[in-house]
Structures are given as C-alpha cells and as structure tokens.
From Swiss-Prot:
Protein's UniProt name: Probable nicotinate-nucleotide adenylyltransferase/Ap4A hydrolase
Catalytic reaction(s) noted: nicotinate beta-D-ribonucleotide + ATP + H(+) = deamido-NAD(+) + diphosphate; P(1),P(4)-bis(5'-adenosyl) tetraphosphate + H2O = 2 ADP + 2 H(+)
Residue numbers binding ADP: 201, 231-234, 261, 287-288, 305, 311
Segments of this protein annotated with the region NaMN adenylyltransferase: 1-187
Family in the record: In the N-terminal section; belongs to the NadD family.
Entry keyword annotation includes Zinc-finger: no
Organism: Mycoplasma genitalium (strain ATCC 33530 / DSM 19775 / NCTC 10195 / G37) (Mycoplasmoides genitalium)
Pathway per the UniProt entry: Cofactor biosynthesis; NAD(+) biosynthesis; deamido-NAD(+) from nicotinate D-ribonucleotide: step 1/1
Chain's role: Catalyzes the reversible adenylation of nicotinate mononucleotide (NaMN) to nicotinic acid adenine dinucleotide (NaAD). Hydrolyzes diadenosine 5',5'''-P1,P4-tetraphosphate (Ap4A) to yield ADP.
Length: 350
C-alpha cells in the first residue's frame, strides 16, 4: 500500500484553529501518513506578510503538536520558491513511491486554471479541496482538474481578520503566547483598529515612551508596546465602548465616554488578544485618569501621550513647555509626571 503525503501550503500568518481542523480532517479522510505544513516564502511579496519567516515557522511548530502525523517543511522558504510545481517535485523526490495530495481552499479552487504548470501539477498530485465561506465548491473546475472534495470547514476564521477580532478562542494558546511574548502583529493590529491619524499618534507615543524608558533604565520594548497600544480602543463606536465598559468592566461612574477607551483598550488587549503583561495592561488602563498609585511605566505612557512631538501644534499645550518636560522626564520622571498631571487636571477644570 502506497504511503500518502499531504502538502498544505499557505501564509499561516498566523496559523489558527481552522488550519488545524482542516489538517486533522484531511489526514483522517485521506488516511495520510504525513501532512506537511509548507509556509509560503516571504520575500518577493513582503508587504503581504506581517510575521517573519522565522516566526511563522516557530508558530507552526508550536501549533502542530496537537496534530498527529503533521510536520513543518521550510522548503519554500529555504529555496525562496514561489511555484507550487517546485514544491510538489520536491516532495515527489523525497517520497518517490508515495501518493502526493495538494490541499487547497475553495477560494484557490476558483483560480486553479490560472496556476503556472497546472497540467503538470494535475499529473503529479491529487488536489483536495476544503470548502470555506464565502467561496462555494466549484464542481466545474473541480471536474476539470480532478479535484477531490474534502469537506466544509465549520470554522470561519481568516488570518487577516484576526487583527481586530477576539483571538483567544481562534488561535492555539501556545501560538497566542508566542505572539504576545514577541509582540507580533502590533502594527497591523493598530492599523485595523484606528485610522491613519490616530495610528501615527500611537506610533509617536510608543517611540517617546521607548526613549523615556531607556533614559530611566526601564524595559524599552515593553514601554513601546504600551505606548503604541494606548489608544487601541479610541475609535470603537461609542455604543460598543460604553457597552464593554459598563457590561464587562462594570464601570458606572465616569466623567465622559471619552475616557473609557483606556479601560476598554486594556480589556481588549487582555481578553481579546490574550496579553498577560500586567504592567502593559495597567499602563494603558491608567493613561486617561491615573490612580494615586502609579508605576513608572504608567507615568511614562501618560507622559508620552501628553508630550509626543505633535502635541506642540495642539491648543491644549499652550501653557506648557513640552521639550523641557521631555528633557525633565529623562532625568526626573516623577517630577515631570506630577507637573504634567497637574497641568492637565487644571486644564480640564477650566
């Protein structure tokens, strides 16, 4: 009996639970001895990827521990390969007596006739297709290329949609922890949550927070992440913002809905995205109305938000020397924080 090998290619940026469901189902239905996840090379089309080749492989290796007979191949990445024919030929040479199956989604099925070397591929391997919404299984194209129907995938997950959706139930826990430990997807997540003007503000806050952290001998990367994410929830619809604040966080007493984004942003990072770093969570939560007891990171994010370079052009800063306060914050963080806090509080009273 011939050994059966499945090739499952894709960006896996990141790998998620739908990928794992499909892999397990394919192995079972085809009775395959091996399934290889083959991440696409991130080279020519760099803008299409958010995580590096190294990180995507690392996440795959963590994820496949739950899939029997699954392996990760770096062939496409190692050889900078962009053509499926090369991938299939590689596996044919490694397993010359095996049956090769090439796993695709119904979205790719519709493009199959446009693939390079499609007739050769048809002869070298058997295409198997899983159906994913909103792309129905195209029987006409399937018959043309002898594509076997696998099943419908009940999990509607797309890697691109994970940027502004709750991730905790959609991504394997080990992968989620890897993402958060290495602060992956920060930039695309911000871009998915806020408009460009707010995004640029977040980056400036992150960069200034990093500078202040370095000057105060604190974790620069943590400060950048907290600063960049501080306005994560700033542009949520008001009704959603208020609903999360009142229903999930039980906040009932607040001066204006405009301050709720700090609490909701911290909630989203923790409960949607699985961030466990309490210092980052608290710094974001405390950046609008700081409590009496604040950490150094709290002070840094608060200051970076109020003193980032573009604040000079804004009306609120008319009576405050931003450059001088930034300089002071690098040598005496607490003093700079107290001066800025008092100024802002007086401004609000007026």
């Amino acid at each position: 009996m011939k050994q059966k090998i499945i090739i499952f290619g894709g960006s896996f940026d990141p790998i998620h639970n739908a990928h794992l469901y499909i892999a397990k189902h394919a192995i079972k239905k085809i009775k395959a001895q091996k399934l290889f996840f083959v991440p696409t090379y991130n080279g020519i089309f760099k803008n299409n990827f958010h995580a590096s080749n190294k990180d995507r492989i690392a996440m795959l290796k963590l994820a496949i521990k739950s899939v029997n007979n699954a392996l990760v191949s770096n062939f496409d990445i190692k050889t900078k390969n962009a053509f499926s024919i090369n991938t299939v030929n590689h596996f044919k040479s490694c397993y010359p007596t095996s049956e090769i199956y090439f796993l695709i989604g119904s979205d790719k099925l519709n493009e199959l006739e446009k693939w390079d070397h499609i007739q050769q591929l048809k002869d070298l391997c058997t295409f198997v297709c899983y159906e994913r919404k909103p792309y129905p299984f195209n029987k006409k194209i399937a018959n043309q290329f002898n594509v076997k129907y696998l099943a419908k995938c009940p999990l509607e997950i797309a890697s691109s949609k994970l940027l502004n959706q709750p991730r905790k139930k959609l991504i394997p826990l080990a992968v989620l922890n890897y993402i958060n430990t290495n602060h992956l997807y920060l930039i695309p997540t911000l871009k998915a949550m806020v408009d460009d003007k707010r995004f640029q503000h977040c980056l400036r806050v992150g960069k200034l927070a990093k500078q202040l952290a370095i000057a105060n001998k604190l974790d620069a990367k943590r400060a950048f992440v907290a600063g960049a994410y501080h306005d994560l929830a700033k542009q949520l619809p008001v009704d959603q913002l208020v609903n999360i604040a009142t229903s999930e966080l039980k906040i009932t007493n607040y001066p204006s809905w405009k301050v709720l984004h700090s609490y909701v942003g911290a909630y989203i990072l923790k409960n949607w995205f699985g961030v466990k770093d309490k210092m980052i969570i608290n710094a974001i939560k405390n950046h609008t109305i700081p409590p009496k007891q604040v950490s150094k990171l709290d002070m840094i994010v608060y200051l970076a938000d109020k003193l980032e370079p573009n604040r000079k052009q804004e009306q609120w800063s008319g009576g405050i020397e931003i450059d001088q306060l930034v300089k002071l914050a690098k040598s005496n963080l607490k003093q700079a924080y107290l001066i800025t806090l008092k100024y802002v509080q007086n401004l609000v009273k007026d």
